[in-house]
């Protein structure tokens, strides 16, 4: 989930680019549902033996009626049934679409590791201030076995869900259906449906599912009651969703495009993200990482309609560190060379992501709502509406500081929340997030992974065979 950079982001009517809206298609045909696991069938065979005389024939006839047949040695054996038997699904097997909770598959809670990368030699004698030293010690203390188990479980949920999603994210599918598949899969695999009070805080979705088309760079999700949006052949779709287990958030994103004309755009962004992951590490300077990302990203160009267009790194979004139950920490990793003295530190968790665009390389707020986030330290003194107080209680008990969407509220059965939400927003208790767009006609791609900076290695926890 992309984080806004302090500079370069353009808001409101004075933005450099004209207003645009997310393209929508109404009443499209629904795609066929994905098939489940194929069940094998075992067929039985019948074997009959005849005797030499009438007595034997009569005996065999009686045996046939009783369901017993003789062997060659004269001993009787039971006749095989013609009934077809279903092959049982073995334990530890996932379904298609994925709906079996991971604790039911990984009984010992030994989830797959991410990609383990050893650190290059570094200077362990670097001096840090006392405050930094205390922060390091706290972070390392928290990076225990439970921490790794939670993170690896969340990462495996992400891998299994996105593997299925990649198979159905084809032209003709509705964005609402794609979001439903992602969210249903995450809830099923974590084993937490998020309906009972507090259940969504134990494990589940870490923020609203992002499904951003073309010039929409980030923060767009289908909302209940809105016009349906259908994926088309010439679309560039960014799929960004997060999974958490006990507040340990895995944030990972990828881009799909059916038209091969955009292959170079996707290649550029994937290469830039992998460069950021390669350079990330303990004591790594963030300005150096940003410069390396930009150099790789902007070495590519895309040919569209016979015109070569350079790929530009977005200047208004950044990667970010992740805290427990908070998708955005205080550190940012821009995609362009920047002046900062910040370094990555031991115990940090980072979402290393990059966005590349064929447009201007800047984003602005678009009309619409992506999601909501609680300002945990905001005063509630001016809150008078009963509906707002009730909604605030629901938000605190079920989402805390996790970002959520209208769809998540309605999944819990919350109704008539619009007036209360407006009151919470006007009192600065809840922040509203809008879609972020580049200029109309441009195309933006995104790739993202979560990396843990462990004491002796970095673990790209969300890495899979796909990206």
Swiss-Prot record:
One example of a Gene Ontology biological process annotation: proteolysis
- Function according to Swiss-Prot or TrEMBL: Cotranslationally removes the N-terminal methionine from nascent proteins. The N-terminal methionine is often cleaved when the second residue in the primary sequence is small and uncharged (Met-Ala-, Cys, Gly, Pro, Ser, Thr, or Val).
Question: Which keywords accompany this UniProt record?
Answer: Aminopeptidase, Cytoplasm, Hydrolase, Metal-binding, Protease
Q: Which family does it belong to?
A: Belongs to the peptidase M24A family. Methionine aminopeptidase eukaryotic type 2 subfamily.
**Record-listed a divalent metal cation 1 binding positions:** 240, 251, 448
What are the binding positions for a divalent metal cation 2 in this chain? 251, 320, 353, 448
Q: What is its EC number?
A: 3.4.11.18
Locations of Basic and acidic residues compositional bias?
1-10
**Residue numbers binding substrate:** 219, 328
Gene Ontology CC, one term: cytoplasm
Q: Where is this region: Disordered?
A: 1-105
GO MF, one example: metalloaminopeptidase activity
Provide the reaction this enzyme catalyses.
Release of N-terminal amino acids, preferentially methionine, from peptides and arylamides
This chain's protein is named Methionine aminopeptidase 2-1
Name the cofactor(s).
Co(2+); Zn(2+); Mn(2+); Fe(2+)
Looking at the UniProt entry, the stretches that span the membrane are: none
Could you tell me where the Basic residues compositional bias lies?
A: 75-90
Q: Cellular location of this protein?
A: Cytoplasm
Show the InterPro entries listed in the entry. Answer: Creatinase/aminopeptidase-like, Met_Aminopeptidase_Type2, Pept_M24, Pept_M24_MAP, Pept_M24A_MAP2, Pept_M24A_MAP2_BS, WH-like_DNA-bd_sf, WH_DNA-bd_sf
Q: Which organism is it from?
A: Arthroderma gypseum (strain ATCC MYA-4604 / CBS 118893) (Microsporum gypseum)
What's noted on cofactor binding? Answer: Binds 2 divalent metal cations per subunit. Has a high-affinity and a low affinity metal-binding site. The true nature of the physiological cofactor is under debate. The enzyme is active with cobalt, zinc, manganese or divalent iron ions. Most likely, methionine aminopeptidases function as mononuclear Fe(2+)-metalloproteases under physiological conditions, and the catalytically relevant metal-binding site has been assigned to the histidine-containing high-affinity site.
Keyword Glycoprotein appears in the UniProt entry: no
Annotated signal sequence is none
Per its UniProt entry, what is the enzyme's top EC class, as one word? hydrolase
Matches recorded under SUPFAM superfamilies:
Creatinase/aminopeptidase, Winged helix' DNA-binding domain
| Gene3D superfamilies registered for this protein in UniProt | Creatinase/methionine aminopeptidase superfamily, Winged helix-like DNA-binding domain superfamily/Winged helix DNA-binding domain
């Amino acid at each position: 989930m992309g984080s806004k950079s302090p500079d370069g982001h353009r808001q409101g009517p004075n933005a450099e680019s004209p207003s645009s809206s997310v393209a929508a298609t109404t009443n499209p045909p629904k795609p066929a549902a994905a098939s489940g696991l194929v069940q094998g069938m075992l067929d039985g065979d019948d074997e009959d033996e005849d005797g030499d005389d009438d007595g034997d024939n009569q005996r065999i006839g009686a045996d046939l009626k009783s369901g017993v047949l003789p062997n060659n040695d004269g001993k009787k054996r039971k006749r095989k049934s013609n009934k077809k038997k279903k092959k049982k699904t073995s334990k530890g097997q996932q379904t298609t679409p994925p709906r079996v909770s991971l604790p039911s598959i990984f009984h010992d809670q030994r989830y797959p590791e991410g990609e383990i990368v050893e650190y290059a030699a570094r200077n362990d004698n670097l001096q840090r201030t006392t405050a930094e030293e205390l922060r390091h010690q706290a972070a390392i203390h928290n990076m225990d076995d439970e921490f790794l188990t939670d993170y690896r479980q969340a990462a495996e949920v992400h891998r299994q869900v996105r593997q299925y999603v990649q198979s159905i994210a084809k032209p003709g599918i509705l964005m609402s259906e794609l979001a439903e598949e992602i969210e249903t899969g995450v809830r099923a695999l974590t084993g937490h449906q998020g309906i009972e009070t507090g259940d969504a805080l134990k494990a589940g979705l870490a923020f609203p599912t992002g499904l951003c088309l073309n010039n929409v760079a980030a923060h767009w999700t289908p909302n209940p009651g809105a016009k349906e949006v259908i994926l088309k052949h010439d679309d560039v779709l960014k799929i960004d969703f997060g999974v958490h287990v006990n507040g340990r958030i895995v944030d990972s994103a990828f881009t799909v495009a059916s038209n091969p004309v955009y292959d170079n755009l996707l290649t550029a962004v994937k290469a830039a993200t992998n460069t950021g992951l390669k350079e990330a590490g303990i004591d790594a300077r963030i300005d150096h990482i940003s410069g390396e990302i930009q150099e790789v990203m902007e070495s590519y160009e895309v040919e569209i309609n016979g015109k070569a267009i350079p790929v530009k790194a977005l200047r208004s979004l950044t990667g970010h560190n992740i805290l427990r139950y908070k998708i955005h920490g205080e550190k940012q990793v821009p995609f362009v060379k920047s002046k900062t003295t910040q370094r990555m530190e031991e115990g940090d968790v980072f979402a290393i992501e990059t966005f590349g665009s064929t447009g201007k390389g800047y984003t602005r707020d678009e009309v619409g709502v992506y999601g909501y986030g609680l300002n945990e330290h905001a005063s509630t003194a001016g809150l008078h509406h009963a509906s707002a107080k009730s909604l605030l209680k629901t938000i605190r008990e079920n989402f805390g500081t996790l970002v959520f969407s209208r769809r998540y509220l309605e999944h819990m059965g919350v109704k008539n929340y619009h007036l209360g939400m407006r009151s919470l927003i006007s009192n600065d208790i809840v922040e509203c997030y809008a879609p972020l767009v580049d200029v109309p006609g441009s195309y933006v791609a995104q790739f993202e992974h979560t990396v843990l900076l462990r004491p002796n290695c970095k673990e790209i926890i969300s890495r899979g065979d796909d990206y």
